[in-house]
Amino acid sequence: MKDTIRQLIQQALDQLTADGTLPAGLTPDIQVENTKDRSHGDFASNIAMMLAKPAGMKPRDLAARLVEAIPAHEQLAKVEIAGPGFLNFFQDHVWLAASLDRALADERLGVRKAGPAQRVVIDLSSPNLAKEMHVGHLRSTIIGDAVARVLEFLGDTVIRQNHVGDWGTQFGMLLAYLEEQPIDAEAELHDLEVFYRAAKKRFDESPEFADRARELVVKLQAGDPDCLRLWTRFNEISLSHCQKVYDRLGVKLSMADVMGESAYNDDLAQVVADLTAKGLLTEDNGALCVFLEEFKNAEGNPLPVIVQKAGGGYLYATTDLAAMRYRHNVLHADRVLYFVDQRQALHFQQVFEVARRAGFVPAGMELEHMGFGTMNGADGRPFKTRDGGTVKLIDLLEEAESRAYALVKERNEQRAERGEEPFDEVQLREIGRVVGIDSVKYADLSKHRTSDYSFNFELMLSFEGNTAPYLLYACTRVASVFRKLGQGREQLGGKIVLEQPQELALAAQLAQFGDLINNVALKGVPHLLCAYLYELAGLFSSFYEHCPILTAEDPAQKDSRLRLAALTGRTLEQGLELLGLKTLERM
């Protein structure tokens, strides 16, 4: 709908330019936003205020000319001027109802991509191996997964790349520690965190041990069979731990998506050679660097992008450049999204620019750093255990499930006291599992990607506010309508007719699902989908309260309201699925 309004405004601008009202050569960015108060229309634009000065007119006078010039359209009932010169657009109720009937009949809810389908590489999760995933890996994993799901829903070909840290100094450290232990020490690897901490302690305390670790890194890089065998074993155990976390979280990541740093080892020397051939490298204290004038330090000197250390070793930038080339040459990506901590923003700005200058990626290939903020504890500091240690992600999820189970068990007892049929233990465990995992994920996804946020079990498990339990309950409320009806959502007849204010408000929100999904795909911001679903659930609650469904006054009204309820249920479920959340029929 927003695209339609933009096109209509552009046609009006073209007409006013042709008749001399507007000067030639104006190319405004036409903004169309949702109104906060639907009594003032469904959409609004400030285009008249933007162009009043170049037109030499008062904003309201230009707005009046625009209203006259905007062509009639079946989707619009009227256009009005508000305040200093806003244009308010009112949807046609008959067209709106018909569009919702079409959406209900469509398995994709009438959602289509705004633009051609693309091949999109999603770089997500990417934990360092040789130790277990911790809470710091949550955001990249679930935000990347949600955006990948949205892009797939819109018809893009999505290629997930789990760029795990499976190479580097930490492996020399672990190999050296394994040398010192009894033969059965390999069994300890099943608690990777304990093993890693012990090795790190030796590395920090013993210079001889640290030297041996570095020697083993060199042997590993040279292809020593024994080192490679143990390195492979470390990675297998690490990836097995990771997969358990992914399965527990319900994210679409598997072993087939793993493309670690080591996968690019054979290309690193060639990356340096190609940068040299392009004349981009400068030697600085023995290191090979690319200096970009666009990026300077506080003294005004260009910052280096180091691609080879003085000792010959390679860095993250070198591996990232090799990965970009692979993603162009082999994966044929049109767009690459990097879900990596916001603190790496400068790094990505630099390597993107180097990749383009070197010709590793074409100008038309989109490279986007989808940075995110930090998950903190209640004190606003990075989330830690009580003794200051790193919180394992699997432990966090287990606690979430345990807390959710206790919550739903208490509500189940209240259910029995009211004379309602209680859930059995198997059902309670499943409900607790879904509520627990969904709550952790939704609490994160509902925050703006670039913002830091404080982790709080009590808030995220609440049945009030913008939380997973609230939305899950909204889904079960819709499902209960059709259980009482004794009929499936797919068997509905009649058509949607919009009469009451609550029906119109709900319908207007449902109609915006397609625009919203396209916006999430464009910007990589799942919190917009969370906010949409929360508002949709609230509007359904108001509709449910004020517009009787099963006891409607006549069959046509009942059919219409059932269809609105069905479309709401499907939209909520589809939206939650795109966020990577499970839903429940009853809770």
Swiss-Prot record:
What EC number(s) does the entry state? 6.1.1.19
Q: Which GO terms describe its cellular component?
A: cytoplasm
In the record, biological process GO terms are: arginyl-tRNA aminoacylation
Which Pfam families does the UniProt entry name for this protein? Arg_tRNA_synt_N, DALR_1, tRNA-synt_1d
* Keyword DNA-binding part of the UniProt annotation: no
Q: Where is this motif: 'HIGH' region?
A: 127-137
Write down the PROSITE patterns for this protein, in alphabetical order: AA_TRNA_LIGASE_I
GO MF annotation list: arginine-tRNA ligase activity; ATP binding
Alphabetically ordered keywords of this record: Aminoacyl-tRNA synthetase, ATP-binding, Cytoplasm, Ligase, Nucleotide-binding, Protein biosynthesis
Location relative to the cell: Cytoplasm
Q: Which reaction does it catalyse?
A: tRNA(Arg) + L-arginine + ATP = L-arginyl-tRNA(Arg) + AMP + diphosphate
The cross-references to InterPro entries, in alphabetical order and at most eight, read:
aa-tRNA-synth_I_CS, Arg-tRNA-ligase, Arg-tRNA-synth_N, Arg-tRNA-synth_N_sf, ArgRS_core, DALR_anticod-bd, Rossmann-like_a/b/a_fold, tRNAsynth_Ia_anticodon-bd
NCBIfam families, sorted: argS
The similarity comment for this entry is: Belongs to the class-I aminoacyl-tRNA synthetase family.
How does this polypeptide assemble, per the annotation? Monomer.
The entry's protein name is: Arginine--tRNA ligase
Q: Which organism is it from?
A: Pseudomonas aeruginosa (strain LESB58)
